[in-house]
């Protein structure tokens, strides 16, 4: 309700339930996610090599930084991380998962602990907002502005939840933080969450750039959780 209260001509086109994630119940998937968190520095160095395979799902084989990944034409996966071996069958979206989707799932898993405690509510992952144009009226519609802001006709929110009073929007970054990520999260949070909306920039690595740190610090509606103390920083928000 927080999203529809603060937005015009919007509808939820994808509910963002955990169970909607393809192959989410594959055995050992959560174990792999936790393992990737521990090896986040090493896996981040492989993203550029894997990204070309995300759209067409071609097979690939990569061995680097004590990580071995085999993705086959039948979508089976073999991955070894620091002597931990994992095998999966028919995981078509694995290239998306391994290039950053895993971090969204890791962040969700940490927040799920808070939801189970009753600290937060209505936790979603990958919720999508659709825009629909109303019939012509004298009041100008901001559809073009939205399209320019979000670069498409819909917006996917990595993770959303509420504490019962305001909407929280989490933007997850498995790689380095860039200035445009901060501006994007500020805009999305304000638009969908209103003046009380709170953005959380979740990152595997804390920003090293002083300007980026200052931009986040000066922001009134964004909090940063990152790096070694990620879980503690996330919990301390509440």
Language model segments and positions:
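Intrinsically disordered, low-complexity Ser/Thr/Pro/Gly-rich regulatory segments
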Residues: 1-238
